[in-house]
Design a protein with these regions (language model features):
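Periplasmic-binding protein-like
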Residues: 58, 133-144, 206, 210-251, ...
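Acidic, polar ligand-binding/catalytic clefts
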Residues: 81, 85, 90-154, 220-225
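Short helix-initiation/N-cap motifs at beta->coil->alpha
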Residues: 93-104, 148, 182-192, 196, ...
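C-terminal motif of bacterial Sec signal peptides marking the signal peptidase cleavage site
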Residues: 14-17
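Extracytoplasmic small-molecule ligand-binding "clamshell" domains
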Residues: 26-117, 265
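Short loop->beta-strand "edge-of-pocket" segments that line small-molecule binding or catalytic clefts
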Residues: 51-56, 151-168, 180
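Extended ligand-binding regions for polar small-molecule ligands
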Residues: 19-21, 27-37, 74-86, 151-159, ...
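Alpha-to-beta junction loops
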Residues: 53, 89-90, 107-116, 158-159, ...
Length: 274
């Protein structure tokens, strides 16, 4: 399993999660009273190692994007840092190759949070906050593809790529009657296979499809959708006592416009109306 660890330190490029505590809050453990006790309990549950470990994977604006200058954006990336600021703990960004590995990291208690599709299958192995964002699920097809509409996809001989271990792999594997589901190891591999004519389509949420389309000349996203994803904050099983606090955190981000700003910075496309 490929994994990279980025630690938000107190020197150099300081992450939001490591910014000084707001005036009046003080350093962790310095305040007294019920509010401080509640914060300490929340910190102990969500960041038991003393740092908030945020699981991400590259290529999706819902998780992590890195531009040519090294600037990092993404919903998981930024929300993790904002939660670290709330908890007054440093943030560690733990990078994986694909979303299934992030879920495995949560299951193994190697990371503390991520933002991902709150599918029924994943809810069996991790716990979720209330949904933050809804995304359309669709198909990306290469130039000169014989697939012209969503209805054309489920036909004999059609090869549909999905990220290995993703929700799309499970759902389409059950739904398709004729088309073949082809698991791929990464979005980079998917782009290469689309350009090489080894895939007739690639299926995932439209946020990722838009990013992928930018790297595959002539590729286009089919009109319509085959489903919806509901993105939420995921935490390891056994920490469900912190879900009310996570829901409050998420609702505040939605209410004050912070989540909308994070979505804009990530260039997240393909969102669905609530």
């Amino acid at each position: 399993m490929k994994r990279r660890l980025f630690i938000a330190g107190l020197v150099g490029a300081v992450l939001v999660g490591c910014s000084p505590a707001p005036v009046g809050q003080g350093a962790p453990g310095s305040a007294v009273g019920p509010a401080a006790s509640a914060l300490a309990a929340e910190r102990a549950t969500l960041a038991p190692t003393g740092a908030l470990r945020v699981g991400v994977y590259r290529g999706s604006p819902t998780s992590l994007l890195v531009d040519n200058t090294g600037q990092r954006t993404g919903v998981s990336y930024e929300l993790g840092q904002l939660l670290g600021q709330r908890l007054q703990v440093p943030v560690q960004i733990v990078e994986y190759s694909r979303v299934a590995e992030v879920i495995d990291g949560l299951k193994a208690n190697q990371v503390d949070i991520t933002v991902t599709n709150a599918s029924a299958a994943r809810a069996q192995v991790v716990d979720f906050s209330k949904p933050l964002i809804s995304l359309e699920l669709g198909y990306l097809v290469p130039a000169r593809s014989q697939v012209q509409t969503v209805a054309d996809v489920d036909r004999s001989g059609i090869r549909v790529g999905v990220t290995e271990g993703s929700s799309s792999q499970g759902v389409l594997g059950r739904q398709f009657k004729a088309a073949k589901v082809v698991p791929v190891s990464s979005l980079k591999v998917a782009a290469d296979m689309l350009q090489a004519g080894q895939l007739d389509a690639f299926a995932t949420n439209k946020a990722i499809l838009n990013e992928l389309a930018d790297t595959v000349p002539g590729a286009r996203i089919l009109e319509g959708r085959w489903g919806l994803e509901h993105m939420a904050i995921a935490i390891p099983k056994g920490r469900e006592g912190s879900l009310p606090q996570l829901d409050t955190f998420a609702q505040q981000l939605q209410k004050d416009g912070t989540l909308a700003a994070v979505i804009r910075r990530a260039g997240l496309r393909g969102t669905a109306a609530p």
